[in-house]
Amino acid sequence: MLKNFKLSKRDSNGSKGRITSADISTPSHDNGSVIKHIKTVPVRYLSSSSTPVKSQRDSSPKNRHNSKDITSPEKVIKAKYSYQAQTSKELSFMEGEFFYVSGDEKDWYKASNPSTGKEGVVPKTYFEVFDRTKPSSVNGSNSSSRKVTNDSLNMGSLYAIVLYDFKAEKADELTTYVGENLFICAHHNCEWFIAKPIGRLGGPGLVPVGFVSIIDIATGYATGNDVIEDIKSVNLPTVQEWKSNIARYKASNISLGSVEQQQQQSITKPQNKSAKLVDGELLVKASVESFGLEDEKYWFLVCCELSNGKTRQLKRYYQDFYDLQVQLLDAFPAEAGKLRDAGGQWSKRIMPYIPGPVPYVTNSITKKRKEDLNIYVADLVNLPDYISRSEMVHSLFVVLNNGFDREFERDENQNNIKTLQENDTATFATASQTSNFASTNQDNTLTGEDLKLNKKLSDLSLSGSKQAPAQSTSGLKTTKIKFYYKDDIFALMLKGDTTYKELRSKIAPRIDTDNFKLQTKLFDGSGEEIKTDSQVSNIIQAKLKISVHDI
């Protein structure tokens, strides 16, 4: 199945080297390359008797020393909560992230992030020490998680991360890329895995055992076991057993008949459901225009055009789209490419596709999701009427009572855009335009406050406003204001009566210099310079962002 493929060496006990996603690198002589786009996890303990398959090519003392530094820290800590850095010396982190501790300073750890290589200090109270000297307790959690897996599924399965690129040479093999996550379905003689990629179409197909590392989802650690132990621990089926289980599952869930009959049945059901919809509310066009971050959760701005001339602006999360995809694939198996005809040929898939959820979402992932979702909803609208007008699809685009969704006449939206475009001299014209989904700005990252900006700034200008801020903001109430300095983002809690001098005194300790200027932060760059108390009051009232620049 793979020419010149050799399994990794094992020690006298038959144990392979323990490796984690921190050790992932492309198969080359240079072990210094770092895969930056994947989240790494520390290893419980490292076997000194063996190394990964490709790593055996370079075993100089220097490299071995470096490997020890990376994978064998004296102390490993795990974040219990998320935290945003308040100074340039601190590190920001998300709940569940691991750090290596290099020093201890009263209430702070001096730590490094193995995923990014950044070093800094983190508050002790936000972390728990991960004790790697007690494998029994970790194994106990492994056993517990595996028991749950076996109880919930008829056949065992594993989760793995690809260590090296693998190019398929036969039709039954699966091409994989370093850093990819795989779902392991079965094995062949403990030398090959039947795997499916998570996050893209493809598979199932054969992947060499030595090209992946098995990860325990319950702990986030590489299991560190011999591959045979991992296979036995979850009763991973052989290829033949796996095929038999799949066949039995299909036989018990799909009635006999041709694809045409299945299609006719699936057409009849949705038509009955879509009969409830009003013709004037049929969806004509949909697009995903931008995304935002609110309460540490990303969401997407969806624009819909209806056949009655109205427009909708909707706030949706990625899980909403994915749940719909799962429902549609289950309700329309023929259109999903899951049925065979009498000749054994699979039906043609016409359903659009989006990748499944991932455990850790970043800004770059969300940008890619925004592009994928924009294509997904456009394809969804163009599906046959019995799908696109079904109740399932309709439910995604209805106006919800979430404080954001709204429906209005299309002419009203055009007038809003025209007014904003004519107001080029207004300080916040660019920001106001961005609150409309027709904005042409390239930066599609919005926050909840940004999308309310048009209402709050209808008569507001930093330099031109003579109206004093509302009395309620000058009291004890505080407002969170973000400021951006170089590559860092900071948050300040400011009272409504905060002065320009007080604002500078709060910012100065968090940056590298005492010589700096303040400007409003717009979506396409920096705006007006902030110099007066009234400008600061207006910023707090409108919950704007501040950009800090060295002079």
UniProtKB/Swiss-Prot annotation:
Ranges where the SH3 domain occurs: 72-132, 155-217
Q: What name is this protein filed under?
A: Bud emergence protein 1
Query: InterPro entries of this UniProt entry?
Result: Bem1/Scd2_PX, Bem1/Scd2_SH3_1, Bem1/Scd2_SH3_2, NADPH_Oxidase/PX-Domain, PB1-like, PB1_dom, PX_dom, PX_dom_sf
Q: Describe the task this protein carries out.
A: Necessary for cell polarization during vegetative growth. May link the cytoskeleton to morphogenic determinants on the cell surface.
Which residue ranges are recorded for the region named Disordered? 1-73
User: Annotated Gene Ontology MF terms?
Assistant: molecular adaptor activity; phosphatidylinositol-3-phosphate binding; protein-macromolecule adaptor activity
Entry-linked Gene3D superfamilies? Phosphatidylinositol 3-kinase Catalytic Subunit, Chain A, domain 1, Phox-like domain, SH3 Domains
Q: Name one GO cellular component term.
A: cytoplasm
Q: Which Pfam families match?
A: PX, SH3_1
Q: Listed disulfide bonds for this chain?
A: none
Q: Which residues carry this modification: Phosphoserine?
A: 47, 255, 258, 458, 461
What are the residue boundaries of the PB1 domain, all occurrences included?
478-551
Keyword flag Phosphoprotein: yes
**Biased amino acid composition, Basic and acidic residues:** 55-73
The miscellaneous remark of the record is: Present with 6490 molecules/cell in log phase SD medium.
Q: Which BP terms does GO give this entry?
A: cell morphogenesis involved in conjugation with cellular fusion; cellular bud site selection; conjugation with cellular fusion; maintenance of protein location; positive regulation of vacuole fusion, non-autophagic; regulation of Rho protein signal transduction
Source species, please? Saccharomyces cerevisiae (strain ATCC 204508 / S288c)
Report quaternary structure and partners: Interacts with AXL2 and BUD5.
Q: Which SUPFAM superfamilies match?
A: CAD & PB1 domains, PX domain, SH3-domain
Q: Which residues form a coiled coil?
A: none
Keywords, in A-Z order:
Acetylation, Cytoplasm, Cytoskeleton, Phosphoprotein, Repeat, SH3 domain
Q: Which domain of life is it from?
A: Eukaryota
